[in-house]
């Protein structure tokens, strides 16, 4: 979720990675094909995993849950591990896209915070193990837009030309719904229409609809305010210490990104070894420090080598979290509505 990245891989390279390049066969090789959000892992850990296990990791990125889902549905790719967010895990379970996990091969599951076990999107963690969790908030430059405490700042004409907005319907509608006092998981037609009207009014004051570019534009100062992930805010601060972050008073989206194994994966045991590795305490702590997102491992917070201010962003108070909601998988009728209004909004 995650940090900005642009990935360009030629068709020939994809075929080499996932279909094998020509030449004499040397027999089965230990490989693992991972599909994850951009810049959402410490690449040194991939090398460490390869050294410890002898399993070669082929690694590719996507920008959003919807992009990942679309690529998988189109077929023609052969990934083993994917890392969708909570609501997308539920959708993929419903559509029989995931393999059940053998928790005997994932002993680090015992270190997962009990609050993150047995989630509504995957009871008993039959198909998924939490990878990282976090919150969506507003990142802004107070010198340009003042202090921000509400989602209303993203709809304020005073900030015209400086505002960025998520370029996907679920996140954008979720923000509008929260600002209006509704659940981001509502299926009520009147509430959805109200949020759509708000987004239509906002369109004229936006600098643009973007995803990964939010990171680049806010960090560089090209834009002054936009919604993004708490973990990325900590990274932005390294190059732009004037930025601030807030979880709006109306509440926000709390998300869990989870490691899953795709249905029919050719390297299931390798995938389970990878999942177990990534959730071990030392590895998860190093990964969390690098990407800025919150580990589900209960031992990690105490060993993080980060400032208390950084930890406060990564671990919001119970009071703040009580106002946050996780996205749930919506009925197909509502998903169709989202698709239709997004086409209208972007046209």
Task: For the regions a language model picked out, list residue spans one by one.
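Extracytoplasmic ligand-binding site segments that recognize negatively charged/polar headgroups
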Residues: 78-222
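A ligand-binding cleft/hinge motif common to bilobed small-molecule-binding domains
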Residues: 88-91, 225-242
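Short, hydrophobic alpha-helical packing/hinge segments within bilobed ligand-binding/sensory domains
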Residues: 68-69, 89, 214-217, 232-233, ...
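Periplasmic-binding protein-like
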Residues: 134, 196-201, 239-263
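Mature extracytoplasmic/periplasmic domains
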Residues: 262-322
């Amino acid at each position: 979720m995650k940090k900005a990245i642009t990935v360009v891989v030629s068709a020939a390279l994809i075929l080499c990675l996932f279909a094998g390049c020509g030449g004499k066969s040397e027999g089965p090789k230990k490989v693992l094909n991972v599909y994850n959000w951009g810049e959402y892992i410490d690449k040194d850990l991939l090398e460490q995993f390869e050294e410890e296990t002898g399993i070669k990791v082929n690694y590719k990125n996507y920008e959003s849950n919807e992009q990942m889902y679309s690529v998988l549905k189109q077929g023609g790719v052969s990934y083993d591990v994917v890392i969708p967010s909570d609501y997308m895990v539920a959708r993929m379970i419903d559509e029989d896209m995931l393999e059940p996990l053998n928790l005997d091969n994932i002993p680090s599951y015992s270190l997962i915070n009990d609050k993150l076990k047995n989630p509504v999107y995957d009871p008993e963690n039959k198909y998924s193990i939490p990878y990282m969790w976090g919150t969506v908030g507003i990142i802004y430059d107070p010198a340009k837009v003042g202090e921000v405490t509400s989602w209303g700042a993203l709809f304020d004409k005073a900030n015209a030309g400086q505002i960025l907005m998520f370029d996907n319907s679920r996140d954008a509608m979720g923000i509008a719904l929260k600002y209006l006092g509704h659940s981001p998981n509502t299926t009520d037609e009147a509430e959805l229409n109200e949020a759509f009207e708000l987004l239509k009014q906002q369109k004229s004051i936006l600098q643009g609809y973007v995803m990964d570019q939010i990171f680049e534009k806010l960090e560089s100062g090209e834009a002054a305010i936009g919604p993004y992930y708490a973990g990325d805010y900590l990274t932005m601060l390294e190059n732009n210490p004037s930025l601030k972050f807030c979880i709006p008073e109306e509440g926000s989206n709390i998300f869990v990104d989870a490691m899953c194994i795709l249905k029919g994966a050719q390297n299931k045991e390798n995938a389970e070894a990878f999942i177990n590795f990534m959730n071990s305490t030392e590895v998860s702590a190093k990964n969390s420090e690098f990407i800025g997102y919150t580990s589900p491992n209960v031992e990690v917070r105490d060993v993080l080598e980060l400032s208390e201010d950084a930890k406060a962003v990564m671990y919001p108070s119970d009071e703040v979290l009580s106002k946050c909601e996780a996205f749930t998988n919506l009925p197909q009728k509502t998903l169709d509505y989202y698709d239709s209004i997004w086409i209208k909004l972007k046209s």
